[in-house]
Amino acid sequence: MQLPIPLFPATLIRRYKRFLADFELESGEIVTAHCPNSGSMKGCATPGSPAFLSRSDKPERKLKYTWELVKADGCWIGINTGLPNRLVREAIENGLVAELQGYQTIRPEVRYGENSRIDLLLCNADQLCYVEVKNVTLVEGNAVLFPDAATTRGQKHLRELMGVVRQGHRAVNFFVVQRADGEFVAPADLIDPEYGRLLRQAAANGVEILAYRAHVAPEGINITGKLSVRM
């Protein structure tokens, strides 16, 4: 998946109010960018970190720049949570996710459950597969952890997926790891113990838990391979 062109190299000054971040461009200009990530971004928002921004000149945009990538622990990390759904869809369509082949159509953002929208609904003549996509950026030691902040929304999604299984459909919680380090994915129990409990409950009740790594670079982001999940 190609990132917006061109990207602008920048240095992070600070992130604040969740959706705002200040950067210094190579020219020395200081700009405020939209931060498309509602999590804590633990380990990914250290002042002085190299970053890449995209730019939109649409007149309705209040902030022209969007934060796309940050460099931490020696690797580029994709922090834009608006991209993983498209990334996973492209990977499925290109045959890169063996577990999700054989479906005739893929529909994005379909309403289901209690006022929820599933990220991807895979359909064929005799089966529906509900896929919830989660962007993962936190690494501690060898573990890639989710979530990086308590998430009642994520908890709700797991309950909704269990409901889908009870209705006789297939349900998948799909972790996308947008960084090169870390050896396995695990729930961040110290950050959100209820999410960890629900993830284990979901797995025990038929929800499939998948994790794939993405190669992240200014040239683009692509799914590269499967990671193990440790409960």
From Swiss-Prot:
Pfam families, sorted: SfsA, SfsA_N
GO molecular function: DNA binding
InterPro entries named in the record: SfsA (IPR005224), SfsA_C (IPR040452), SfsA_N (IPR041465)
Membrane spanning stretches: none
Annotated family: Belongs to the SfsA family.
PANTHER family: SUGAR FERMENTATION STIMULATION PROTEIN A
HAMAP family with a match to the protein in the record: SfsA (MF_00095)
NCBIfam families attached to this UniProt entry: sfsA (TIGR00230)
Protein name: Sugar fermentation stimulation protein homolog
Organism of this sequence: Geotalea uraniireducens (strain Rf4)
Taxon lineage: Bacteria, Pseudomonadati, Thermodesulfobacteriota, Desulfuromonadia, Geobacterales
